[in-house]
Amino acid sequence: MIQNTLYWHDYETFGLDPARDRPEQFAGIRTDEDLNIVGEPLNIIARPTPDTLPHPMSSLITGITPQQALEQGLPEAEFIAHILMKLSQPGTCGVGYNSQRFDDEVTRNPLYRNLHDPKGREWQHGNSRWDIIDMVRDCHDLRPEDTVSYTHL
């Protein structure tokens, strides 16, 4: 029997456009449905490609310079292979914040560029995805006194 798990993940990118800008960093952690951590977390940096320029603000936000990413980062094919391995494990629900509009697109583009099925991980082997941004908004709308204000994030 497949164990259903949640894979909480987030990207930092070299810009704001998921179709054009490349991933800079990926972090993810797997939990069971009771939110107990399962396995080891993943935190990897991507090597910038020579055909793109990172937005200068990306380094200020993440603290990772292009030089640091060149030295410590993985080539895109290896970077996305690590991510695909985590997200395509049977029974995985990929969970993110604003992931349907951003992170899923950031994942799909390097998968496509590296000749992987860009959407298979989302539905094959009992897998799914969940963008919690709407849940967070609903919680804020229902109980604004008990949630963090968007202006303080």
Regions found by a protein language model. Name each.
Residues 13, 48, 134-136:
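Short, flexible loop/turn elements at secondary-structure junctions
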Residues 59-143:
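Conserved DEDDh/DEDDy metal-dependent 3′-5′ exonuclease domain
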Residues 151-152:
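Conserved small/polar residues in nucleotide/adenosyl-binding loops
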